[in-house]
A protein has these predicted regions:
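Metal-dependent nuclease catalytic cores that hydrolyze phosphodiester bonds in DNA/RNA
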Residues: 1-132
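Cys/His-rich metal-chelating microdomains
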Residues: 35, 242-245
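Short cysteine/histidine-rich zinc-coordinating motifs and their immediately flanking basic loops
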Residues: 43-44, 247-249
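Short, polar/flexible loop-turn hinges at active-site or ligand-entry regions and domain interfaces
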Residues: 48-50, 148-151, 227
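Catalytic phosphate/metal-binding cores of nucleic-acid and nucleotide-processing enzymes, i.e., regions
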Residues: 49, 180-182, 239, 246
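Mg2+/Mn2+-dependent nuclease catalytic core
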Residues: 100-215
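Polybasic (Lys/Arg-rich)
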Residues: 202-242
Length: 249
């Protein structure tokens, strides 16, 4: 296990020309301003989590499958099944946007008023006959329940998509408010494993509203320019853990 250390790089200072800010850091700020400040200003990151190799494998295979139809400029059969009039978007920057090059940046744009370079790694983009882009995100899951976007934790999925929509509009693309989630649901009703998982694909649409993104960036800027810790979110498990530990030390 890696020894935990205070990070000295990629810290915010009061007068940066630009400061890189990933989509996940925006979500961290919304979850808990204090954790965000500790991470970006003081270099105390939240404890790391293990990766999700099975989810990554699903993403990789879905990208390969949709790339086949991208080359043909034809809709994937499931797009036809759901009546989606679009094809996978063919663009020379797609490998950068979805980080096939492993630079850990993705699509990015600078918000001029804050100096934040907002970054996000997408899974896919589809384009309509009218030239509108649809942001697409792949999600791997395993549930016997109906696939939906109404669970509490899936609100973060919606914010994720809306940030991507915001980025691509700022880059200069015509972006549809309608994005798509492609859920790959691993089925557990099989009798035996037989060295394979079987998945069922479901597409859910989300009508995004990115009007909250810029105001949130302004609030993040204010927090980072303060010299005092912001209040913790009472619902933050990390902060509550630290508080309870202090009580018994």
């Amino acid at each position: 296990m890696t020894k935990y250390k205070q990070r000295k790089r990629n810290l915010y200072n009061d007068n940066p020309d630009t400061y890189a800010l990933s989509r996940s850091k925006i979500d961290m700020f919304l979850d808990c301003p204090r954790c965000f400040y500790l991470d970006r200003k003081l270099g105390f990151s939240q404890p790391s989590m293990p990766g999700w190799p099975l989810n990554s494998a699903v993403d990789h295979l879905l990208k390969r499958e949709f790339d086949h139809y991208r080359k043909l400029q034809q809709p994937h059969p499931i797009m036809v099944q759901y009546g989606i009039e679009a094809v996978p978007f063919l663009h020379p920057d797609l490998p950068i946007w979805r980080d096939d090059v492993y630079h850990y940046v993705g699509a990015s744009v600078v918000e001029e008023q804050t100096g934040f370079q907002v970054q996000g790694i997408i899974d896919d983009i589809w384009v309509s006959p009218q030239g509108e882009l649809h942001i697409v995100d792949y999600k791997a899951t395993s549930t016997a329940s109906e696939i939906s976007l109404e669970d509490e934790y899936k609100q973060a999925y919606k914010r994720q998509m809306e940030i991507y929509q915001w980025i691509f509009r700022r880059i200069g693309f015509k972006v549809s408010p309608v994005g798509y989630f492609v859920f790959a649901n691993a089925l557990k009703d099989r009798t035996f494993f037989e060295n394979k998982l079987e998945f069922e694909l479901t597409i859910l649409s989300h009508y995004g509203d990115d009007s909250w993104v810029s105001p949130t960036l302004f609030e993040m800027k204010k927090v980072l320019e303060c010299d005092t810790l912001p209040d913790a979110n009472p619902e933050c498990e990390y902060c509550e853990y630290r508080r309870l530990i202090k009580e018994v030390e």
